[in-house]
Amino acid sequence: IEEDDRILVGLSGGKDSLALLELLARRSRIYKPKFSVVAAHVVMKNIAYESDQTYLREYAESLGVPYVCYETEFDPSTDTRKSPCFLCSWNRRKALFTVAKDQGCNKIALGHHMDDILETLLMNMTFQGAFSTMPPRLVMRKFDMTIIRPMCLVHEADLKEMAALRGFRKQVKNCPYEKDSHRSDMKEVLARLEAMNPEARYSLWGSMNNIQHDMLPVEEDDSLK
């Protein structure tokens, strides 16, 4: 976060985005760096996923944050190779880009936490054969926008505790595909790894900065020399 940023917070209505909005709203009142916050909730009309918009608006207003609701939809038949989760996520992201531009924002803040990032790392390794995940800061030059994930070092357990303390309301309807995704499976994998080694999450996180190319069965990339 930098001086004079105007940040759009993707407010889904889940505990993570509610926590992120509160934390950024409170942080914006500190003198340096000076930045402003806008909350945006995207309604995907063709997905049976619903949040209490009155609650979200009142919550944002209680924090002194402007609130925007944007409705959109997508046709899953246009690309049957992609899962509904991927198509929904991508179209929500595009909607956030649109709202961000309309609101004069230069950054979009998403509520992903450390658990999300590690689960994505495990998913990409398992299903994509790629050592990659969601970066804390991603410059999207095509859209002239930067995505940030300010809670990248926060544990989901801490956010659950915050949600209980604040009394955050739960979704009216959860996503119908939520339990069918690989993410729910990887959440269990991460829990099992931590049962074997309580420091497993820190080891996984550290591995992203400790890639020993000469100890891997792959050809060395000359650009890394």
Regions found by a protein language model. Give the residues of each.
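Residue-level detector of flexible, active-site-proximal loop/helix-junction positions
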Residues: M44-N46, F74-P76, L138-R141, V154, ...
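Residue-level signal for alpha-helical context at structural boundaries
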Residues: V42, F74, P136, S181, ...
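A short, charged, Gly/Pro-tolerant segment at domain boundaries
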Residues: E199-K225
